[in-house]
Amino acid sequence: MSSGFGQRAVRSLKRRLGLTDRERIKKLLADPPAVEEDRIVFTSSEDYSGNPKALYLYMKEEGLLEKYRVTWLFERRENCFDFPEENVESLCMFNEEGKRSWKAQQAVMRARFVFYSHNVNWVKNFRKEQTFVDLWHGCGYKGALKSDATRVFYDYLMVTGERYIDIFRDVMDDPDGNILDLGYPRNDMFRTRRSDAAAYLASLKERTGAEKALLWMPTFRQSTVKRLDTDIALSSSGIPLLYGEEQLRQLNDCCRAKGVLLIVKKHHLQVTYDLPGEGIDHVLFLDGNDLRKGNADLYELLAQTDGMITDYSSAAIDYMLLDKPLGYTLDDFDQYEDARGWSFDNVKDYMPGHHMYTMEDLLAFVGDVAEGRDPYAADRARILPQMHTYTDGFSRRIAEYFGL
């Protein structure tokens, strides 16, 4: 029996035994379940990460979850795990056939509060008795794709600072929207030790003999999601300034000589990097799965580093809170401007750090960090209050605002 026939037989059997997920969802939309005051849902794009995870952990530690029945929604079945708390359940958003799960649909439709990092437009039924809070996934430099952003539903959306309120109202085509500059819960993780991030980084440094560590977080150029693809390809590797093996080995030699471990964290939307690995010992390439296996939260890991390299990512805005050196790769600035645009004018004026257009610029930044030089500290102090209304207590502030 062919696999195609077998799948059809399974679907046919399911239909005879009961309603399919699609049919159940239609019934839920036609006859919505009652909203229950003690139900709360969390979900994030990379599964148990980012702002929803940080807010959840804060509420758990403060005993604020005890009065709720909590559901965590996961996009990928392989990331789904059971929580030890009796009042916390985990559900996959999709069934075995890759279709939307009716149980996930029901969980959201019954929840009093829904906290998420991107969007939950698939719910299709939003009622006034519910509160949908988009904690969002970053206030950065790059312009948003309006065609995509205007599909995002929320009752409230979080930003880091007052400057971003009007920016997001414009992007979301929501001039009177509830955009709140309460900050991001994930930035609380700079001060916590909930994961094994410190030990994880220490082991990597010990393995290489490095004394200092840099984290490089390039934003995506070639995306796994085609509607988000900027199609910028100055570098065959997919990473700015690393145009090929020669540049990678040059960077690795510099890091080895300076006693620096450089960790390149791949953006979850970036297609796989195309780089050699043989003989590369001081430049390490990691992704979200690597951090998950090491029980290392990304933002707790960032707090342990000595500096950061990025470009147009919101992570640079967050990293300013740590008051550590920043380096910006800008070799594709003009191409990115044409492809995506910027959140505000004169964007380079709000990048308080090394502006790196060449490999020599990048090597100079590595050298400065290795030798403890920080020439842009005053610039960071000047820019920080323009990007962040608050510098701590982000989860607490959100919990208090919504009376959780």
Q: Which residue stretches match the model-derived regions?
A:
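Catalytic donor nucleotide-activated moiety binding site of glycosyltransferases and closely related
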Residues: 71-86, 216-217, 221, 247-291
